Amino acid sequence: MKTFFLIVHTIISVALIYMVQVQMSKFSELGGASEVEDFTPFLEEEKASTPVERSLLSCLYSFSFPA
């Protein structure tokens, strides 16, 4: 049963990350902030290596330091 919930949780997490990336790309197409470039110093400091890590750190950064 734990394995089932782990698989479901993973699928939901990946889907949410994908939805955030799609919304961020739509926002940048409309002339908003760029996707990752605004967080480049933070991401380099944290050594994010995959797109998923970069988007998670970007979300974390945006919630940690609101405008």
Curated annotation (Swiss-Prot):
<comment type="similarity">
    <text>Belongs to the SecG family.</text>
</comment>
<protein>
    <recommendedName>
        <fullName>Protein-export membrane protein SecG</fullName>
    </recommendedName>
</protein>
<keyword id="KW-0472">Membrane</keyword>
<feature type="transmembrane region" description="Helical; Name=Helix 2">
    <location>
        <begin position="54"/>
        <end position="63"/>
    </location>
</feature>
<keyword id="KW-0811">Translocation</keyword>
<keyword id="KW-1003">Cell membrane</keyword>
<comment type="subunit">
    <text>Component of the Sec protein translocase complex. Heterotrimer consisting of SecY, SecE and SecG subunits. The heterotrimers can form oligomers, although 1 heterotrimer is thought to be able to translocate proteins. Interacts with SecDF, and other proteins may be involved. The channel interacts with SecA via subunit SecY.</text>
</comment>
<feature type="topological domain" description="Periplasmic">
    <location>
        <begin position="64"/>
        <end position="67"/>
    </location>
</feature>
<comment type="function">
    <text>Subunit of the protein translocation channel SecYEG.</text>
</comment>
<dbReference type="GO" id="GO:0015031">
    <property type="term" value="P:protein transport"/>
</dbReference>
<keyword id="KW-0813">Transport</keyword>
<feature type="topological domain" description="Periplasmic">
    <location>
        <begin position="1"/>
        <end position="14"/>
    </location>
</feature>
<feature type="transmembrane region" description="Helical; Name=Helix 1">
    <location>
        <begin position="15"/>
        <end position="29"/>
    </location>
</feature>
<feature type="topological domain" description="Cytoplasmic">
    <location>
        <begin position="30"/>
        <end position="53"/>
    </location>
</feature>
<keyword id="KW-0653">Protein transport</keyword>
<dbReference type="GO" id="GO:0005886">
    <property type="term" value="C:plasma membrane"/>
</dbReference>
<keyword id="KW-0812">Transmembrane</keyword>
<keyword id="KW-1133">Transmembrane helix</keyword>
